[in-house]
Amino acid sequence: MNISTIVSNLKDLILEVRAPYDLEITGVSNHSSKVKKGDLFICRRGEKFDSHEIIPEVMEKGAVAVVVEREIDLDFPYIQVFDSRYFEAKVASLFFEDPWKDVLTFGVTGTNGKTTTTMMIYHMLTSLGERGSVLTTAVKRILGNSYYDDITTPDAITILSAMKENREGGGKFFALEVSSHALVQQRVEGVRFDVGIFTNISRDHLDFHGTFENYLKAKLHLFDLLKDDGVAVLNESLADAFNRKSRKITFGTSKNADYRLGNIEVSWEGTQFVLETPDGLLKVFTRAIGDFNAYNAAAAIAALHQLGYDPKDLASSLETFTGVEGRFEVVRGAKKIGLNVVVDFAHSPDALEKLLKNVRKISQGRVIVVFGAGGNSDRGKRPMMSEVASKLADVVILTTDDPRGEDPEQIMEDLIKGIDKRKPYLVLFDRREAIETALTIANRGDSVVIAGRGHERYQIIDEEKKVPFQDREVVEEIIRDKLKGRKYAQ
């Protein structure tokens, strides 16, 4: 690709070109650590950092031109654009040759259930012999090869590069979890989806979006990115908010839903329900626990059924779906000390409420919950989460989540505002101590819920400090110590 190709395809996005039209571009990058010789480097202005300031550095690393949002006082080839984030998505799609074409492409958004629904789609398709890739918060797997990072939806270049790798490797589908941040920051503007799924919406990320209306608007933008024959699959509660021309399919429990759930039963073994589809009734079982997973499964089945897959085959393949790491993840080793322990990513009032209601429903003993709140995020939801915890758990242990540079004392103060002081609660800033205390005070048959961080492998203390910490691993380590202690005591 050369500058001429870029200009001829994206001229409406460009203010000025000061670069030879025959200049060859052999790569696209947006981070100084990833620059390679021959790259077009995209400069972006963020809240804390402006990469226009490091143009000399990327020049030294081999970039042959830069994309800027303002004029630069350097003798170096550049393209000035109106919006570098939007341009990044479009030029990446151009460079990687629209890698979503001729590939079934799924985008899944919503406050809760994004990761699980996306992984259900991936699981069902691979179980049916299809080859493809998936990018979610918890799992990133390109044609069977997995890697880890803690970003829900990567940047446009990463997404489109992965899509090209998928298509060139013979992948027939690509399933992508799409956050509201990614939609606002235009990370998926270079993608077109065959199916967009909107699982549900409740309060979250208002520190970023400002209002609930803006949050909803951001989520709905996913449907603006559908292919011409694309399908919108959404929770029936969102049907009135949908005002696009695309084909709309709903799932829910009312008689008006296109895919109607009923007879939902939850146990420690999994979740079963009946799904009324346009092709008849379907009995569905998945080892993923929680009535919310019935809704996730319904959304995933609806999406694939609309593309021509047999609902019975889809339901059969879901029987082997065991769930997602850090999403109602049962720590199996806890049975050895007589407890049920659940690790979950729930970090909003609605998610925590659904989680605790499901645990309460299938538990014989008390429910003990350990959770905190992320720093530098929506403060308003903190007391709401504590109120939910006080209402649905027998014992609440407040602890640290990811402070991200915010004073943990301030976070805790916000959380305590929602606590019912008439019920047992503890405040333990050390998360490991909080988890160990929960496992120690629990009696045989009790359920311990550790919420907020799910699969995450690091605790973010501030911008400079991340410490290794995974809730499930900590639980397993404490259980091993307890079993060892019992052995020595005998």
UniProtKB/Swiss-Prot annotation:
Chain coiled-coil ranges: none
Post-translational modification: Carboxylation is probably crucial for Mg(2+) binding and, consequently, for the gamma-phosphate positioning of ATP.
Cellular component annotations (GO), alphabetically ordered: cytoplasm
Enzyme class: ligase
EC assignment: 6.3.2.37, 6.3.2.7
Subcellular location: Cytoplasm
Keyword Cell wall biogenesis/degradation attributed: yes
Chain positions with N6-carboxylysine modification: 219
pH dependence: Optimum pH is 9.4 for the L-lysine adding activity.
Keywords: ATP-binding, Cell cycle, Cell division, Cell shape, Cell wall biogenesis/degradation, Cytoplasm, Ligase, Nucleotide-binding, Peptidoglycan synthesis
Activity under varying temperature: Optimum temperature is 68 degrees Celsius for the L-lysine adding activity.
Residues reported to bind UDP-N-acetyl-alpha-D-muramoyl-L-alanyl-D-glutamate: 32, 152-153, 179, 185, 187
GO biological process terms on file: cell division; cell wall organization; peptidoglycan biosynthetic process; regulation of cell shape
Record: residues binding ATP: 110-116
Molecular function GO labels: ATP binding; magnesium ion binding; tetrahydrofolylpolyglutamate synthase activity; UDP-N-acetylmuramoyl-L-alanyl-D-glutamate--D-lysine ligase activity; UDP-N-acetylmuramoyl-L-alanyl-D-glutamate-L-lysine ligase activity
Pathway: Cell wall biogenesis; peptidoglycan biosynthesis
InterPro entries in the cross-refs: Folylpolyglutamate_synth_CS, Mur-like_cat_sf, Mur_ligase_C, Mur_ligase_C_dom_sf, Mur_ligase_cen, Mur_ligase_N, MurE/MurF_N, UDP-N-AcMur-Glu-dNH2Pim_ligase
Catalysed reactions, as listed in the record: UDP-N-acetyl-alpha-D-muramoyl-L-alanyl-D-glutamate + L-lysine + ATP = UDP-N-acetyl-alpha-D-muramoyl-L-alanyl-gamma-D-glutamyl-L-lysine + ADP + phosphate + H(+); UDP-N-acetyl-alpha-D-muramoyl-L-alanyl-D-glutamate + D-lysine + ATP = N(6)-(UDP-N-acetyl-alpha-D-muramoyl-L-alanyl-gamma-D-glutamyl)-D-lysine + ADP + phosphate + H(+)
Pfam family of the protein (one): Mur_ligase_C
Family in the record: Belongs to the MurCDEF family. MurE subfamily.
Extra facts: The peptidoglycan of T.maritima was shown to contain approximate amounts of both enantiomers of lysine and no diaminopimelate.
HAMAP family in alphabetical order: MurE (MF_00208)
Function summary: Catalyzes the addition of both L- and D-lysine to the nucleotide precursor UDP-N-acetylmuramoyl-L-alanyl-D-glutamate (UMAG) in the biosynthesis of bacterial cell-wall peptidoglycan. Is also able to use meso-diaminopimelate as the amino acid substrate in vitro, although much less efficiently.
Protein's recorded name: UDP-N-acetylmuramoyl-L-alanyl-D-glutamate--LD-lysine ligase
Organism annotation: Thermotoga maritima (strain ATCC 43589 / DSM 3109 / JCM 10099 / NBRC 100826 / MSB8)
Biological classification of the source: Bacteria, Thermotogati, Thermotogota, Thermotogae, Thermotogales
Gene name for this UniProt entry: murE
